[in-house]
Amino acid sequence: MTKSIYEFWISQGKDKLRLPVLPEQIDISNTIQNESVKVASFGEITFIDKPGAKEISFSSFFPKKHSPLAEYKGFPSPENAIAKIEKWVKSKKPVQFLITGTKINLTCSIEVFSYTEGQKDIGDRDYEIKLKEYKTASPRKIKQKKKTKKKRPSKSAPKTYTVKKGDTLWDLAGKFYGDSTKWRKIWKVNKKAMIKRSKRNIRQPGHWIFPGQKLKIPQ
């Protein structure tokens, strides 16, 4: 015989589980406020408008044999109840959490589920469960602005730099571009002149430059 107007249900599609023993208390929280609600005094639960995802946690037990605390007869064995919840966890799909007599009817993900040997009778299983409201993000339409063709700036004539003692293309790239790894830009436009000045630049590209040598510095 049902002892309370409140029934705790967890389901996934047509697969359902009614919890045999009501928890003494459930904790409901969101990013705006926290509250503890006694099962015996359930009433209308009001949340601040547009709260964050609600989190619900509680603990109870699955009885092995008929218990005076059980809400109904023919409840599943602890092993079957645990197997069902673990199957939902592994599916990585949301479940529906419903408490009759209240406005709690949420699509949730199972964040935590743990169980231990019961403290009351042999074969019972105490458990703790934490659920988090599952919210799907609705797609938003984004208006794309029409791209206007930007006029390409006219290429300016390459700058000329006179090599000083101790200069390297690596250092010059760092000086003009703020990035020494771009030394090949300078090498590319000066390749012929540098090889003509020293054939060693064939084997060691850009390595051989000399004081007084003029190099083009592309923009």
From Swiss-Prot:
Pfam family, one: LysM
Domain LysM span(s) in chain numbering: 159-217
Superkingdom of this protein's organism: Bacteria
Biased composition (Basic residues): 139-154
Region (Disordered): 139-160
PROSITE patterns per record: LYSM (PS51782)
Annotated PANTHER family: PHAGE-LIKE ELEMENT PBSX PROTEIN XKDP, POTASSIUM BINDING PROTEIN KBP
Name by which UniProt lists this protein: Uncharacterized protein YqbP
Organism of this sequence: Bacillus subtilis (strain 168)
